[in-house]
Design a protein with these regions (language model features):
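Conserved glycine-rich Rossmann-like NAD(P)H-binding loop of the short-chain dehydrogenase/reductase
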Residues: 26-42
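Residue(s) in the substrate-gating loop at a strand-loop-helix junction
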Residues: 145
Length: 301
């Protein structure tokens, strides 16, 4: 509702920017956080031009102190937010045993700890606001991925973090239901949507950059990710609109491609039937054949 406040991480591009713009269109105050200072400044100006009161907060949400500052500044200017979008994320691929300790630290830091920091720090204030006002409503949206519901090969560390975000958010929803009727959660699981996530290495902190050259599997994963993301037909704006509709409907699982859930069903059937994981390429075997050949050194992917 107009006059309420939304906090959005990863707000300078992709889903985060669209969440910010559509929050502004709804008359909300908008708090925007991003690790890219120049992009954040431009995004803040764009959202401000849409008519919103905007607060920009630069920093890496993998660091708890950054999220604490984000909370403090939000409370100081607007009070407890009604909407929290823990949206910032990065992507990294390759064979799972080839991820370095720095790879794990970087991707876990942003994709999982960043979400955990947001939930840990903001949720108590949202619950407190709900307790003080019977009509107060709050909602937390955590951005996961279809990679949080299935396990595609050559995407190990990314899959791990996104599965963790789904588990975190399911637990958050269950825990909220124990203590309040006024704050709820949703998990966003987008498929391939044109955003900047396939180029997220541009924001990797210097101290967490990999030493040495990328492995062949990592180069293949990067190329496949860029191709898949850029070819997506559903826009970030479409996903943001679906997310706001889901918030209003108190819908927990949010999908960018609701007609592309067959792999999720197959995985659940594998689990229930104690069946070995199904071949993810069974419907497009030529892709699997090319990937196997490339990783075994027979031919390029």
């Amino acid at each position: 509702q107009a006059g309420q406040t939304a906090v959005i991480t990863g707000a300078a591009s992709g889903f985060g920017l669209e969440f910010s713009l559509q929050a502004a269109q709804r008359g909300l105050n908008v708090v925007m956080s991003d690790v890219q200072a120049d992009a954040l400044e431009a995004a803040v100006q764009r959202v401000r031009q849409a008519g919103a009161t905007v607060l920009g907060c630069h920093g890496d949400i993998a660091q708890s102190a950054v999220v604490q500052t984000l909370l403090d500044r939000t409370l100081e200017q607007f009070g407890a937010p009604h909407l929290l979008f823990n949206n910032a994320g990065v992507a990294h691929g390759g064979l799972i045993w080839e991820h370095t300790e720095r790879d794990w630290d970087w991707v876990l830091g942003v994709n999982l700890r960043g979400v955990a920091h947001g939930v840990r720090l903001f949720t108590p204030h949202m619950i407190k606001a709900a307790q003080a006002q019977p009509g107060w409503q709050g909602h937390i949206v955590n951005t996961a991925s279809m990679a949080g519901l299935v396990c595609a090969p050559n995407m190990g560390v990314y899959n791990v973090t996104k599965h963790a975000v789904v588990a975190l958010t399911e637990t958050l929803q269950q825990d909220l239901c124990l203590v309040t009727d006024q704050v709820r959660a949703s998990v966003l699981c987008p498929y391939f949507v044109p955003t900047g996530i396939s180029h997220s290495h541009r924001n990797r902190p210097p101290e967490l950059r990999s030493q040495g050259k990328p492995t062949p599997s990592q180069l293949i994963a990067q190329a496949m990710s860029e191709k898949a993301v850029s070819s997506g037909k559903v826009s970030a704006s479409d996903v943001a609109a679906a997310t706001f509709a889901a918030i209003e409907a108190q819908q927990f699982y949010i999908y960018s491609h609701p007609n592309a859930l067959a792999p999720v069903q197959t995985r659940m059937e594998d689990v229930l039937m104690s069946r070995n994981p199904s071949d993810p390429f069974k419907d497009r075997p030529e892709i699997g054949q090319r990937l196997r050949a490339a990783l075994r050194g027979d031919t390029p992917a």
